[in-house]
């Protein structure tokens, strides 16, 4: 119990320390169930072939609202003492769209206190901006004619392909797991068309989870998740309960500063079969946008082969039911 209170205190301290303005990158309310999405070092940690299909509609009902689709697949690769994986991403917000394909490798080191993994993920992103969806105060939009009267904005669809690199570390012990990762680093920036080039800041992620031993077949997991671009940061605290690896329910709170307060998250999950899991999260908006949308919906379908592939990593000393 002393370990638990230390963990809770650290979570509250980190949440308060990082309560700056704004938010960075795409939000993800089911992050604790799909950690490979933001940390390539988590590959293979589920000890079998694992796949996830994620869909998120943020601020539903708001025109041009952010939408995200993601496919993650990873599996142990003992020949190289680690794991391999790939990620397919499609995101859209307003006139912008991104489609990415990335592959990853992570090396897993076993020690007396747990498993330590370091991983890297790299690939390409196709970025596009549809100028026909943009409007300016002085633009000319008679009929099908489009002229923004702004040389920095395109009047048609422009696109470009950019390389991207991501990296992370992850530790898994008997009662505690934590990871630190960097995502969305574009070494050459992003180029759209002939004239538009920009260099977005990479995102940094910290994830920490504590495992409370089961009682009455229920396991409790308090979690802290922090995202930052080193200018703006946002913290989220959540707790979830798993019952017999069959049903899960959780609640979370995102944003602890007056300018970063974002949402309260309610989530639930169920095991559909021996290999499939279904999760759903609903974000109740708390920011200034809360009156303009109908909440945020997120759906995750996960698959786990349920078999150890080959031989290599030993079973955990204490079984930590992460599957829900």
Functional labels for PLM-detected ranges:
Residues 23-324:
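Subset of outer-membrane beta-barrel
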Residues 16-23:
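Bacterial Sec-dependent signal peptides at the C-terminal "C-region" and cleavage site
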Residues 8-16:
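Bacterial N-terminal signal peptides
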Residues 1-9:
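Bacterial N-terminal signal peptides that target proteins for export
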